[in-house]
């Protein structure tokens, strides 16, 4: 792709722990989120916006710059985090991806940061909670 090309690809991504087991403890959560964020920041094909979730799944918002393969990217992120945290973290196969416009970025970031409250009060976006796994 030429450096004169323009692409605006914003994605909301979610993936779950193996068997939806609550692997993401309050103790593990900050380290996991920092690990994922740092990997994204170091990747020149991605721009980090937000990460959040609850004990059995992660939500992530990022922008992607071509060329990229989302399936491969998510697989590498899940694999690297499992390797980093060992048996204390296992992921289910599959994921959910939803594209969104830049005008919705603020809302998506807020949705991700408010995951615990949204799940507690059941104020969820069906579209952003979709996931296809085992």
Regions found by a protein language model. Give the residues of each.
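Basic nucleic-acid-binding interfaces
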Residues: 1-134
